[in-house]
Amino acid sequence: MVKIMKKKKIIVAMSGGVDSSVSAWLLLKQGYQVEGLFMKNWDEDDSNDYCSSKIDFNDVKKVCKTLNIPLHTINFSEEYWENVFLNFLKEHKKGNTPNPDILCNKIIKFNICLKFSLKYLKSDYFATGHYAKIKKTKKNFYLYRAHDKKKDQSYFLYTLKSKILSKIIFPLAYFKKKKIRKIAKKIKLSVYKKKDSTGICFIQPKKFNSFLKQYIPQKIGKILTMSKEFLGLHLGYEFYTIGQRKGLNIGGKKKKKNAYPWYVVKKDIYLNIIFVVQGLRNPYLLSYGFLTKKIHYINDNIFYFKKKCVVQIKYRQEPIICEFFKISKKNNYIKVIFKKPILYVTPGQSAVFYLKNKCLGGSIIKKNIPYLP
């Protein structure tokens, strides 16, 4: 009697975008049993003006109908609120600029949602439309940059461990974005023209401040130069980030005959003061390193690679060579020094370390080390 091999079942996290939609099609083409899962992390009843989940869900339904695959839905809005959004607010109140998408990947998407797929939907693997690669050795699974370096999203995935990576598939690992859109058009997916999502996973960047004001009260404070010259008033330090230019409302202010734009360089959260400097290349905007406390390793201890390692402190930023130094056993601080000073090192953001295209792990920036004191 011929033994029939059962198809591997893969649950694809469907966002309503072109990437996750084509990911599902690619897996179908490879012969897997594919089912879609729409994950809702935000209740639009709380904020109709900001959340697009209704539109996204309708797009997912259309795609699943076209592909003829089952669609599951799950609401993780309570888990998201407790584990991601409250942390997001807490960090803003500390004067930091957090990245909730990274925390969402760690706690919601590749933890709670992954476990739900494996346990309750009986899947063998969990797939998403991220641009990243997973490579396997005899002992471990490793995270690498995607073939499309412009779209690479490994920066947002550095918190994942080898055990988690063993259950994940990234179908777009070796594809360029242009190719994905061409495929979507060719197979007549309704989302082939849909714009890529930007900003936080539940809100568009243009509406960010008005959204944040619902949860953090405005507190009028001073905008000062580094020499303590008064330039104007701001709405509260929580609404500004290091390197910010827009929204300061001091564009017409000129110091001497210098008409360069102003940038946020420092925040005093106790006195509610925003400090600004003029000019994109102002040395006050530069840092030669940062302090962090805990580094997450995907597999290998980063200190083994400290002379070869590069660090990326923002999404799509050019990585820079760095070195590591343990400077205090008491508070466990680690100092990371760049080969050359760089702009806008922002507390609360993630610093992700690479060995060539291999993602080693990362950490949260606790404090920048300014080029000028």
UniProtKB/Swiss-Prot annotation:
Its main location: cytoplasm. GO terms for molecular function: ATP binding; tRNA binding; tRNA-uridine 2-sulfurtransferase activity. Residues 99-101 are annotated as: Interaction with target base in tRNA. SUPFAM superfamilies: Adenine nucleotide alpha hydrolases-like. It is an enzyme of class 2 (transferase). The record marks 130, 349 as: Interaction with tRNA. It is found in: Cytoplasm. Pfam families: tRNA_Me_trans, tRNA_Me_trans_C, tRNA_Me_trans_M. GO terms for cellular component: cytoplasm. InterPro entries: MnmA-like, MnmA-like_C, MnmA-like_central, MnmA-like_central_sf, Rossmann-like_a/b/a_fold. The active site is at residues 104, 201. Interacts with TusE. HAMAP family: tRNA_thiouridyl_MnmA. This is tRNA-specific 2-thiouridylase MnmA. The gene is mnmA.
